[in-house]
């Protein structure tokens, strides 16, 4: 079910911005990932990201042993809303995902899937990078849901290639 996008977009972080974050990042009170990024979902453990404009947390329905979501604090609907100006942000999201795997001593990056679901196949309408490893552990459904460069899921490499054109 898609997350409702109505609500207060552009509202400042109700808890106040953390040091180094954009003072006016878009906030949608109806978006669960905006609330997670603002620290308003206490059951969601946030992991440190070097880039203060991002948050990282575990997926609630992991497809493999390691399944993290890297999310910009700024509300961006999906990968369809990105352009060349977002390349650096996407690259930072990838770096944050790799760091999470390395912290867990996972370094076989040939067995990692990183990518985004494409609307209307997004369960939450807030941009989020899936960082999943090891891919060899995927069951039948995960192989389908996270199928590389399908109509519903695109890899980071595919997205960056499109953004650079």
Curated annotation (Swiss-Prot):
Matching entries from InterPro entries are given as: HIT-like, HIT-like_sf
- The segment annotated Disordered runs over 1-23
Q: Which residues bind AMP?
A: 59-60, 128-130
Annotated PROSITE patterns = HIT_2
Annotated Gene Ontology cellular components are:
cytoplasm; nucleus
Top-level taxon of origin:
Eukaryota
Under CDD domains, the record lists: aprataxin_related
Q: Which UniProt keywords apply?
A: Acetylation, Cytoplasm, Hydrolase, Nucleotide-binding, Nucleus
Q: Which reaction does it catalyse?
A: adenosine 5'-phosphoramidate + H2O = AMP + NH4(+)
EC class of this enzyme?
A: hydrolase
All disulfide bonds of the chain are none
Instruction: Give any Pfam family that matches.
Output: DcpS_C
What are the HIT domain coordinates in residue numbering?
32-143
Motif Histidine triad motif, chain ranges: 126-130
Q: Which Gene3D superfamilies match?
A: HIT-like
- Using the record's annotations, give every residue carrying the modification N-acetylalanine: 2
Entry's localization field: Cytoplasm; Nucleus
Give the protein family.
Belongs to the HINT family.
* UniProt xrefs under PANTHER family: ADENOSINE 5'-MONOPHOSPHORAMIDASE HINT3, APRATAXIN-RELATED
- What does the protein in this record do? Exhibits adenosine 5'-monophosphoramidase activity, hydrolyzing purine nucleotide phosphoramidates with a single phosphate group such as adenosine 5'monophosphoramidate (AMP-NH2) to yield AMP and NH2. Hydrolyzes lysyl-AMP (AMP-N-epsilon-(N-alpha-acetyl lysine methyl ester)) generated by lysine tRNA ligase.
The molecule here is called Adenosine 5'-monophosphoramidase HINT3
UniProt lineage: Eukaryota, Metazoa, Chordata, Craniata, Vertebrata
User: Gene name?
Assistant: Hint3
């Amino acid at each position: 079910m898609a997350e409702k996008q109505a609500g207060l977009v552009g509202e400042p972080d109700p808890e106040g911005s953390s040091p180094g974050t954009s003072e006016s990042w878009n906030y949608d009170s109806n978006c669960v990932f905006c609330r997670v990024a603002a620290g308003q979902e206490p059951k969601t453990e946030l992991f440190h990201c070097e880039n203060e404009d991002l948050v990282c947390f575990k997926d609630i329905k992991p497809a493999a042993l390691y399944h993290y979501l890297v999310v910009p604090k700024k509300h961006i609907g999906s990968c369809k809303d990105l352009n060349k100006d977002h390349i650096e942000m996407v690259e930072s999201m990838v770096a944050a995902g790799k760091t999470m795997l390395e912290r867990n001593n996972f370094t076989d990056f040939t067995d990692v899937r990183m990518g985004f679901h494409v609307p209307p196949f997004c369960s939450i309408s807030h941009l989020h990078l899936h960082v999943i490893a090891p891919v060899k552990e995927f069951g039948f459904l995960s192989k389908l849901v996270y199928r590389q460069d399908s109509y519903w899921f695109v890899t980071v490499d595919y997205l960056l290639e499109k953004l650079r054109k």
